[in-house]
Amino acid sequence: MSAVEKLPEDFCANPDVAWTFPKVFYTSSQVFEHEKEAIFAKSWICVAHGSELAQPNDYITRKVIGENIVIIRGKDSVLRAFYNVCPHRGHELLSGSGKAKNVITCPYHAWTFKLDGSLALARNCDHVESFDKENSSMVPLKVEEYAGFVFINMDENATCVEDQLPEFAERLNQACSVIKDLKLAARFVTETPANWKVIVDNYLECYHCGPAHPGFADSVQVDKYWHTTHQNWTLQYGFARSSEKSFKLDPSVTDPEFHGFWTWPCTMFNVPPGSNFMTVIYEFPVDAETTLQHYDIYFTNEELTQDQKDLIEWYRNVFRPEDLNLVESVQRGLKSRGYRGQGRIMTDKQRSGISEHGIAYFQHLVAQHHK
């Protein structure tokens, strides 16, 4: 970190008097390379809802900080995760998602692996001196099912997800009691030209909701909205009303609420008014100024109603582009000579619905990994 300004020990520790990271922290490849190792290679990263891996042979692939990962449910129903490369010469093994065969076959030299990662066959290995079959298996990494979702961790010494996000699963299930019944209904994939922290900053405040999200703000009432911080996660919640511009609520729903959870380091779980569906924003940082995002929408029913289809299109064509335009503009603006280098975090004493104290909390956590 020699070429990058060191952060003070108490950076953003007091949210009432706090400024954002110096702009270099959003643009520097040196900073990003440090965060790859200090944060993403040592944290539990949420990659999917459990329904995508519910049955034996189900698999998905994800790219996280340049690593290609495969998560697969074995014939024994055990969920496992591996680096998605052949140990022979490094060719990638599986692509996309779907149903794996009973063995994984490398497209390059046809080495085959069982779904537990062990080597099944390496052609001609009987004629290769001192061939070590035991050390020719796929390389595993940690995986855990938690709160209805699937998390991976590249740190072989990592403890459980609950240690990283204490009490999060309990609170999420209180907000949405049907998590385990959810099924993927839509996914919007964007390679967003913005640093991962810009995207989290944007999520962690509703100061922008009125000006930038008129449809959302017509339903979720910012004057009845709170933001609480917890250990490595935060919760934004508030009361909502039915809106023709966004969430059309069933009249039978009493006291409808919105819940928005951010979890370390960069996954956002939303339980919209009605509490019977969810949206999740998965962030997979690519480089200092690019973040691959999956915006997933989950319902309990497979055959969607017209209202659900209309809501998906509102997310696709209205709400999602609103946020993408914001973070992309910020990333460009951070590099302007007209930006003074840091922005004041607008925390108010009453911690109102438009207070930015959530950003200060997040940035303080990140700063602890830059010591």
Swiss-Prot record:
| A single BP term in Gene Ontology | carnitine metabolic process
Where is [2Fe-2S] cluster bound in this sequence? 86, 88, 106, 109
Annotated keywords: 2Fe-2S, Iron, Iron-sulfur, Metal-binding, NAD, NADP, Oxidoreductase
Q: Where does Fe cation bind?
A: 208, 213, 323
Q: Which cofactor does it need?
A: [2Fe-2S] cluster; Fe cation
Keyword Acetylation in the entry? The reply is no
Q: In which pathway does it act?
A: Amine and polyamine metabolism; carnitine metabolism
Name all Rieske domain ranges. Answer: 44-152
Q: According to its UniProt record, what is one Pfam family this protein matches?
A: Ring_hydroxyl_A
Q: Which CDD domains does the record match to this protein?
A: RHO_alpha_C_2, Rieske_RO_Alpha_N
Recorded catalytic reaction(s): these are: (R)-carnitine + NADH + O2 + H(+) = (3R)-3-hydroxy-4-oxobutanoate + trimethylamine + NAD(+) + H2O; (R)-carnitine + NADPH + O2 + H(+) = (3R)-3-hydroxy-4-oxobutanoate + trimethylamine + NADP(+) + H2O
UniProt cross-references to InterPro entries, sorted A to Z = Carnitine_monoox_A, Rieske_2Fe-2S, Rieske_2Fe-2S_sf, Ring-hydroxy_dOase_2Fe2S_BS, Ring_hydroxy_dOase_asu_C_dom, Rng_hydr_dOase-A
Q: Per its UniProt record, what PROSITE patterns does this chain match? A: RIESKE, RING_HYDROXYL_ALPHA
Q: Which GO terms describe its molecular function?
A: 2 iron, 2 sulfur cluster binding; iron ion binding; oxidoreductase activity, acting on paired donors, with incorporation or reduction of molecular oxygen, NAD(P)H as one donor, and incorporation of one atom of oxygen
Q: What is its EC number?
A: 1.14.13.239
Q: How is the cofactor bound?
A: Binds 1 [2Fe-2S] cluster per subunit. Binds 1 Fe cation per subunit.
Regulation (activators, inhibitors): Inhibited by EDTA.
Q: How does it assemble?
A: Composed of an oxygenase subunit and a reductase subunit.
Give a short account of what the protein does: Converts carnitine to trimethylamine and malic semialdehyde. Acts on both enantiomers.
What family is reported? Belongs to the bacterial ring-hydroxylating dioxygenase alpha subunit family. CntA subfamily.
Q: What is this protein called?
A: Carnitine monooxygenase oxygenase subunit
